């Protein structure tokens, strides 16, 4: 049975916290049951470095919850221990001994070694390469990690889109060692359409889309998660007439416009069950939207589907509903449905987030300027806010109880926003700080804010900074701002994604395929990592980034320039910071389950320069599963 993740105890701003003595919890959910998490292995990787071989592995959230800091590690090469004393300051090790070998690690608890880890994943070329099955003219748009076979190592599910009209979308699964597991052909119901605004009307089985002819579709309609608690992730996807699974079976429907939600076996690519989507908007055409996962009852993961249909002049009016589902291993059952009232002022963005904004142990669904409660009721609409392309929710201010959000506002097609951005209380929707337009703007482009980001990029100021893509540095809404201290720079770094890459706890920035570091003293950036031979995709994004192997820092998954393979990159920067794997943090892991326009990753505790200790997660494993951290 799945149990809810216990959120943090109330944080009261104090001098000790602001001095960074510890990372205080942000809210309280008294004695909430524990959420079930994936039974991950050590995620050990071996990467060539200038001195020899850099090793990195996971501290599991399950063992940190049980033992806290009383965990050390021994590192082995070909069965011989390399370290003189157990490793305690990080979960990394630099091996400078000559020759190649098979690396493993063992945890040490109370002086007793635990079982040996699986052998390290070899990044012999500085990355792990995953060859893609032949599909001429296709590119990878998104990737979803999931443990499809239950062995503790993530596999990768990818969506592949054609740049040629009348070609189906493809959904494929691969191991990190390069084995193709299966392919699902989404069929004629997913064919890429002509470009232009009309391309925002998705084909019934479309899974994402932003090709040269695909317009600006952002309908992912895929997610990957273990819903039934058997230790293996399922794949959830929109399907329609003609969708063909790995075993050759097809979806057949009375009309090509009919849409379904299919549950796919993550290991075999075969369909396990399917249900039709709600038909509320069927008269207006097919629905696009987003998929994600949320713990709506605080115990079980549920599938969240957001359905969006475009109507009216220039297809510029949206009708939106949420349908949630539960899967017990056999049946996909509707949970609740919520149709967003047209008069509510609720306005969708290009993605959703599933986050426990009120810290009661149950996840809410955030969609731009509004939040839907875990029971399918409207929680709030941010006063005065409209549509934007990016929003972020996390513990941005360690001195303030609860979670905060930052969102930007877009001006286009004659729609003029009231302000360019806003920083707000994620629980109530109250705007805490609101940006201002230039006084002398002349047209939409002068006040359109296409991107906004947040991260701890200035260690001199407690908490996170936030900034936008506003080009005019003299504009009142431009520059870098700190959540407590206001404007701290008139210039800005790149504005695509926040990433944890180097050895400190501050944020770096990911743009295209490179990582850059902001220097607050000079108000400039410098590239600290830039791989060769790979490219970014739509909106300068790679298919995925996140903590999928190694220690708590994040990896980058990029497609090769010839579109024949994916490459997974991990950092080799030394660190003195030891954190449990981010993949076993509730908000962080659920952030992987949503797509649309790819957004930055966050934890639901404060992770920044001031962090000294993070709260123990209240998590457990599925019943009957042997712990990865058990004794040998």
Where are these regions (language model features)?
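Secretory targeting and sorting signals
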Residues: 1-30
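Beta-propeller-forming repeat regions
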Residues: 33-43, 52, 59-66, 74-90, ...
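General nucleic-acid-binding
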Residues: 46
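Short, surface-exposed binding/anchoring microloops in extracellular/periplasmic proteins
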Residues: 49
């Amino acid at each position: 049975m799945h149990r809810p993740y216990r959120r943090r105890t109330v944080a009261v701003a104090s001098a000790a916290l602001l001095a960074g003595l510890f990372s205080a919890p942000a809210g309280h959910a008294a004695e909430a049951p524990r959420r079930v998490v994936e039974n991950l292995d050590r995620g050990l990787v071996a990467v060539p470095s200038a001195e020899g071989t850099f090793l990195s592995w996971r501290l599991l959230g399950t063992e940190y919850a049980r033992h806290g800091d009383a965990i050390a590690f021994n590192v082995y090469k070909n069965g011989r221990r390399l370290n003189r004393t157990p490793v305690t300051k990080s979960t990394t090790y630099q091996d400078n001994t000559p020759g190649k070998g098979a690396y493993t690690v063992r945890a040490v608890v109370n002086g007793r070694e635990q079982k040996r880890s699986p052998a390290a994943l070899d990044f012999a070329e500085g990355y792990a390469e995953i060859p893609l099955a032949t599909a001429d003219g296709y590119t990878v748009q998104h990737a979803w990690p999931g443990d499809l076979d239950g062995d503790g190592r993530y596999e990768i599910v990818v969506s592949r889109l054609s740049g040629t009209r009348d070609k189906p979308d493809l959904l494929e699964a691969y191991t990190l060692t390069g084995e193709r597991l299966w392919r699902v052909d989404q069929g004629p119901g997913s064919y890429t359409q002509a470009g232009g605004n009309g391309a925002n009307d998705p084909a019934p089985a479309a899974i994402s889309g932003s090709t040269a002819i695909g317009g600006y579709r952002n309908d992912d309609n895929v997610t990957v998660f273990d819903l039934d608690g058997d230790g293996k992730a399922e794949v959830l996807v929109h399907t329609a007439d003609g969708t063909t699974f790995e075993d050759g079976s097809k979806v057949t429907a009375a009309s090509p416009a009919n849409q379904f939600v299919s549950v796919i076996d993550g290991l075999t690519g075969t369909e396990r069950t399917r249900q039709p989507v709600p038909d509320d908007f069927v008269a207006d055409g097919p629905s696009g939207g987003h998929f994600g996962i949320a713990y709506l009852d605080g115990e079980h993961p549920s599938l969240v589907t957001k359905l969006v249909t475009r109507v009216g002049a220039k297809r510029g009016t949206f009708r939106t509903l949420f349908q949630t589902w539960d899967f017990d291993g056999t049946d996909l059952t509707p949970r609740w449905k919520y149709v967003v009232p047209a008069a509510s002022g609720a306005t969708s963005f290009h993605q959703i987030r599933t986050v426990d904004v009120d810290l009661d142990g149950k996840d809410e669904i955030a969609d731009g300027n509004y939040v839907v409660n875990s029971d399918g009721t409207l929680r709030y609409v941010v006063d005065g806010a409209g549509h934007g392309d990016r929003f972020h929710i996390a513990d941005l201010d360690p001195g303030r109880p609860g979670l905060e959000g930052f969102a930007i506002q877009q001006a286009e097609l004659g729609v003029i926003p009231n302000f360019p951005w806003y920083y707000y209380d994620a629980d109530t929707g109250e705007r805490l700080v609101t940006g201002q337009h230039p006084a002398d703007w002349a047209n939409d482009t002068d006040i359109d804010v296409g991107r906004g980001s947040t991260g701890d990029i200035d260690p001199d100021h407690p908490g996170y900074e936030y900034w936008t893509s506003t080009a005019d540095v003299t504009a009142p809404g431009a520059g870098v701002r700190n959540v407590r201290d206001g404007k701290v720079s008139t210039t800005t770094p790149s504005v695509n994604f926040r990433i944890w890459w180097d050895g400190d706890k501050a944020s770096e920035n990911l743009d295209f395929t490179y990582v850059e570091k902001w220097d607050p003293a000079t108000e400039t950036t410098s590239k600290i990592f830039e791989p060769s031979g790979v490219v970014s995709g739509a909106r300068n994004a790679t298919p995925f980034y996140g903590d999928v192997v190694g220690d708590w820092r994040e990896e980058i998954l990029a497609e090769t320039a010839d579109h024949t393979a994916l490459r997974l990159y991990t950092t080799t920067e030394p660190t003195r910071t030891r954190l449990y794997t981010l993949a076993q943090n509730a908000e962080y892991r659920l952030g992987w389950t949503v797509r649309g326009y790819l957004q930055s990753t966050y934890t639901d505790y404060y992770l920044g320069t001031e962090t000294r200790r993070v709260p123990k997660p209240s998590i457990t494993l599925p019943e009957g599963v042997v712990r990865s951290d058990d004794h040998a």
